């Protein structure tokens, strides 16, 4: 149910080559969707709204924001229940297309340095653009079920033609493909690479399990901006 790199299977050991991309608790727009089943990652797009993959529609969902480190509390932690979940009208559990949903929070998130909304893309991204990929992972000392770290890495966007030639991308529409060229600075067991951020705007969000090799497939958020904005109207 979540987007996972199995590092030893794909390419062995990953190392982060660009430490400048990393900082203390980056990606304050990421939220953790906690449930009794497999967890997922979403993006805060407004204080009261989260955008997430539709396959993350799970029972007993809780939205966690702010600091995720269980051993260190800093007052930014927030857990908010959803009061409304709207999946994209054309989404089907049997296909990876249109894998988007909007979650309305029971109360607006309190914004702080570790809780910030992310603007939506206003244009399509050009092939070759190097974008930021954000996700959640588990620190080496974390043996629990839930991730405790945010991580970023950089990767270039592929052209639609290149994407369609890959095994992962050939059956997708309204998709965004990225090619992973960075490597991790230390070994992780799992990495949930959930979002693509281009020029400080949300350009892509994970599509089910459709990642393999060195290519990641994401829903192209720009293609759905009208639906998102019409649905997530704060009254």
From Swiss-Prot:
One example GO MF annotation: serine-type endopeptidase activity
UniProt superkingdom: Eukaryota
GO biological process: binding of sperm to zona pellucida; cell migration; positive regulation of acrosome reaction; positive regulation of fertilization; protein maturation; proteolysis; regulation of protein processing
Primary localization class, coarse: cytoplasm
Signal peptide annotation: 1-19
Record domain Peptidase S1: where: 20-233
Pfam families per UniProt: Trypsin (PF00089)
GO cellular component: acrosomal vesicle; extracellular region
Keyword set includes GTP-binding: no
InterPro entries attached to this UniProt entry: Peptidase_S1_PA (IPR009003), Peptidase_S1_PA_chymotrypsin (IPR043504), Peptidase_S1A (IPR001314), Trypsin_dom (IPR001254)
Gene3D superfamilies associated with the record: Trypsin-like serine proteases
PANTHER family referenced in this protein's UniProt entry, alphabetically: INACTIVE SERINE PROTEASE 37-RELATED, KALLIKREIN-RELATED
Main function: Plays a role in male fertility. May have a role in sperm migration or binding to zona-intact eggs. Involved in the activation of the proacrosin/acrosin system.
Name of protein: Probable inactive serine protease 37
């Amino acid at each position: 149910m979540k987007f996972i790199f199995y590092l030893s299977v794909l390419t062995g050991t990953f190392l982060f080559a660009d430490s400048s991309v990393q900082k203390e608790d980056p990606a304050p727009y990421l939220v953790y969707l906690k449930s009794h089943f497999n967890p997922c990652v979403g993006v805060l797009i407004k204080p009261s709204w989260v955008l997430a993959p539709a396959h993350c529609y799970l029972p007993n969902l809780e939205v966690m924001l702010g600091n995720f480190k269980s051993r260190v509390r800093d007052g930014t932690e927030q857990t908010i229940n959803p009061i409304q979940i709207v999946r994209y009208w054309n989404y089907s559990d049997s296909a990876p297309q249109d894998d988007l949903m909007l979650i309305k929070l029971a109360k607006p998130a309190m914004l702080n340095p570790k809780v910030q909304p992310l603007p939506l893309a206003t244009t399509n991204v050009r092939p070759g653009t190097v974008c930021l990929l954000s996700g959640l992972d588990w620190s080496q000392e974390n043996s629990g079920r839930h991730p405790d770290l945010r991580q970023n890495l950089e990767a270039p966007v592929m052209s639609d033609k290149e994407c369609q030639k890959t095994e992962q991308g050939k059956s997708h529409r309204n998709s965004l493909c990225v090619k992973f060229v960075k490597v991790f600075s230390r070994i992780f067991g799992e990495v949930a690479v959930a979002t693509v951020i281009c020029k400080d705007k949300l350009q892509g969000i994970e599509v089910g399990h459709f990642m393999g090799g060195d290519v990641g497939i994401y829903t192209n958020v720009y293609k759905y901006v009208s639906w998102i904005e019409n649905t997530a109207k704060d009254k």
